[in-house]
């Protein structure tokens, strides 16, 4: 279905309201990680170049809805954008009943979550936002899975609703990875719990050629294979589920490989002493914190031969270097692979940064929850809204 792309529109003299994901960490009034801000800059710059009066809105943190709280103010974002855009940028605190916006400047709305009804997608709030603009641009993939007033409702009532370049690029990359992927398609799903990623694992096991599990999730699969996991984080109640997923994958000619060697310790701490063990030698007091080098090499070989790689989640506690070798090897293998690769999710992006492979990954997704819901095959409300407005 055709979604209108902002890049194709004439915006000269138009009031353009862009919903970005500018939810960044702030400490003492200063932005401490600017990845999302950097990702939004090309869209804002393009709207300025096209001669628009640009308004930008986003949420930041989780304030109590309807209450102003300076801790969650957009002011640090305004300060950052003013330096990055080299044009006047100002904060609008009260904007719902009208706001002055001029060509050549950027007006940043105060945190949308200070508005009562934002999360519930309140119709009256959505209509007020829509009345502020000639063109509404949804560019926040990170919140595309939420039907809220600033991400969904406003687009139903704005004169024109379109996708910004960041969102359009995200959908194109995800489509390339999932709709018609170059085979073999390999997915790496890490993280601590099977329960939080069960639907993703279900969905992926039906379409990928090889599903690789890591982190705490892998421990449940190790237990399902009949091995002792000691005191490791795992979910005993999901062992049958893990067995079923493996059987499903194998019936399709795929597999969910279980590590053959693991790195264990007796405590979870930055100074814990790491010990390498065969997977069938794990003792009752051991905790598994990483895959071993043999397992990492086997996975690297799978990645080397892949046509498409989807990476969501590390395979070990990589924050501690002694348990980071598995994730480091996976990161290196993805960097070296000729496959189309897409990485998403907070921990994954931290690993991409730590091992300095950002320029070797084909596409880095800005979405966490939205990335997972896309992988699950769910319809994203904001995308559905844009499709309905594009017809």
Curated annotation (Swiss-Prot):
One of its GO terms (cellular component) is cytosol. GO terms for molecular function: ADP binding; ATP binding; phosphoglycerate kinase activity. Pathway: Carbohydrate degradation; glycolysis; pyruvate from D-glyceraldehyde 3-phosphate: step 2/5. Its main location: cytoplasm. Disulfide bonds: none annotated. It catalyses: (2R)-3-phosphoglycerate + ATP = (2R)-3-phospho-glyceroyl phosphate + ADP. PROSITE patterns: PGLYCERATE_KINASE. One of its GO terms (biological process) is glycolytic process. It comes from the Bacteria. ATP binds at residues 197, 319, 345-348. The keyword DNA damage does not apply. It is found in: Cytoplasm. Belongs to the phosphoglycerate kinase family. HAMAP family: Phosphoglyc_kinase. Monomer. This is Phosphoglycerate kinase.
């Amino acid at each position: 279905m055709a979604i209108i792309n902002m890049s194709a529109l004439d915006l000269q003299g138009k009031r353009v309201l862009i919903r970005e994901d500018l939810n960044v960490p702030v400490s003492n009034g200063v932005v401490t990680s600017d990845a999302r801000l950097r990702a939004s800059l090309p869209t804002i710059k393009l709207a300025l170049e096209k001669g628009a009066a640009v308004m930008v809105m986003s949420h930041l943190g989780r304030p109590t809805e309807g209450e102003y709280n300076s801790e969650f103010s957009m002011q640090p974002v305004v300060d950052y954008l003013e330096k990055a855009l080299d044009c006047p940028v100002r904060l609008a605190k009260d904007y719902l009943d009208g706001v002055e916006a001029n060509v050549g400047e950027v007006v940043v709305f105060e945190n949308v979550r200070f508005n009562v009804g934002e999360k519930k997608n309140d119709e009256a709030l959505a209509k007020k936002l829509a009345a502020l603009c000639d063109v509404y641009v949804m560019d926040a993939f990170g919140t595309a899975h939420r039907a809220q007033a600033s991400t969904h409702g406003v687009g139903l009532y704005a004169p024109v609703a379109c996708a910004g370049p960041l969102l359009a690029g995200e959908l194109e990359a995800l489509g390339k990875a999932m709709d018609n992927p170059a085979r073999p398609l390999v997915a790496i799903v890490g993280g601590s719990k099977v329960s939080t990623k069960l639907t993703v694992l279900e969905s992926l096991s039906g379409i990928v050629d090889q599903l690789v599990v890591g982190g705490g999730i892998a421990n449940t699969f190790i237990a399902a294979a009949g091995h002792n996991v000691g005191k490791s984080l795992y979910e005993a109640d999901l062992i049958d589920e893990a067995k079923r997923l493996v059987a499903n994958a194998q019936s399709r000619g795929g597999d969910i490989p279980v590590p053959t060697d693991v790195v264990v310790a007796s405590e979870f701490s930055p100074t814990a002493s790491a010990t390498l063990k065969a997977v069938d030698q794990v003792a009752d007091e051991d905790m598994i914190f990483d895959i071993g080098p043999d397992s990492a090499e086997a996975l690297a070989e799978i990645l080397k031969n892949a046509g498409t790689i989807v990476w969501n989640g590390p395979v070990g506690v990589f924050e501690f270097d002694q348990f980071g070798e598995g994730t480091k090897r996976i990161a290196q293998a993805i960097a070296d692979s000729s496959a189309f690769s897409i990485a998403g999710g907070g921990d994954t992006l931290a690993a991409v940064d730590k091992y300095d492979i950002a320029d070797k990954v084909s596409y880095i997704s800005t979405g966490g929850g939205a990335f997972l819901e896309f992988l699950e095959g769910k319809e994203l409300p904001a995308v559905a809204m844009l499709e309905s407005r594009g017809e």
